[in-house]
């Protein structure tokens, strides 16, 4: 297929046009007074959002060369969202500012490679300075403030996220779901929960709530199907003698084995319940091992040399309480030894570090949370489906940002941290051409605060000047249109977000500046429609048929 090639300034101008188109659509959402963007959907109602990365992901331009520029900036937003969960609009604004200034310098005859080196040195210095300014997050209140800012100043969301973090701890899993009601609420699960319910409703001990509750229960963990009653007999006899309830977790329990368990339960001989093992394949084996470690039992598996008919009572795990409903099983206060649990946690953490798959990482994180913290579910409520989608996206953003804040600490928000770190660039001494890159970063770092002010209907230059003349956390609160101590006012950004936004923006803008040729497919010529064939005349003669 034939290609079109653009060189030098012609190519860079096309990139700039694409960058500007995408960035101008995204940056209207920045800050507390940022505007909404409405996105048409092929199905259902349009999507209304104030999330930069959502806007960026929807943009495809008709011109292939301009689209390349837009797609590269989209990459900045996506990467920042993946790493830090927030800061996508800031990253887009920075990328546009760096590339716009840089392309002017290159057009004026400066060496793009030297400018890029200057940009890289400046960014390194700023990142080090941001880490110096950064303060560790101390309490519930600061976690709530980070969540509030990231959720576009929604204090309810900030409060719920802080509460969830407090309940399940740093390692805990917090998931976001759609609620059936109008209110947004938080549900937490103590202990280990997995999504498998009882195999028969006859196991229920509380008919009103339709759940089985076993106090001081023994737990049998088996990785194969149980269909033959003979295999289970030795364990059941010992359970009947001990008088304690028994939970059986196996790949499946069917036929004669299940029928016998139900009959014994109904006659009151045994207080028993059976559930299927969670997960599939290798993940199932790992989860059964987790349950065994948590409850101080052993997985009865032929792979490990244990047969079910030879299982002894000391292979069973124990827990203070087990609750089973039709969908979930929750094991509370397992009797596993602390040392074994910590060893297992260490092992899972090592796997999280090594894995390259996001899906695997998420599943490992869930397993870790079940062992150490617990699970919290934020149920997002709203009046309409459109509002629900928008709100759920905000909650997810806020959750990521809060985790980032707990990881690396916080800096003053509203673009102030960038202004405060500018002083570090004064001490940099580089060759003249590279110094242009440093000057360019100095100008670009003012852009987020300018845009926040502009979206609030205030002159950005005046705000930048006033903030530069202030000290420490002094900055512009666009929500109330006043100058305040940003940290005291709760306007804070996670350091990880500010750092990632700048690093990703500078990385992609630097690559675009050093581009000398662009190649794209030539648009296909659409063939013209063929003319109507002749010979269709003469139909009028049919009038004589009357």
Swiss-Prot record:
EC numbers, comma separated: 5.6.1.7
One annotated GO biological process: protein refolding
Pfam families, per database record: Cpn60_TCP1
SUPFAM superfamilies with a match to the protein in the record: GroEL apical domain-like (SSF52029), GroEL equatorial domain-like (SSF48592), GroEL-intermediate domain like (SSF54849)
Sites where the protein binds ATP: 29-32, 50, 86-90, 414, 477-479, 493
Reactions that this protein is recorded to catalyse: ATP + H2O + a folded polypeptide = ADP + phosphate + an unfolded polypeptide
PROSITE patterns reported in the protein's UniProt record: CHAPERONINS_CPN60 (PS00296)
Function: Together with its co-chaperonin GroES, plays an essential role in assisting protein folding. The GroEL-GroES system forms a nano-cage that allows encapsulation of the non-native substrate proteins and provides a physical environment optimized to promote and accelerate protein folding.
Subunit structure: Forms a cylinder of 14 subunits composed of two heptameric rings stacked back-to-back. Interacts with the co-chaperonin GroES.
Similarity section: Belongs to the chaperonin (HSP60) family.
Protein name (database record): Chaperonin GroEL
Organism from which the protein derives: Geobacter metallireducens (strain ATCC 53774 / DSM 7210 / GS-15)
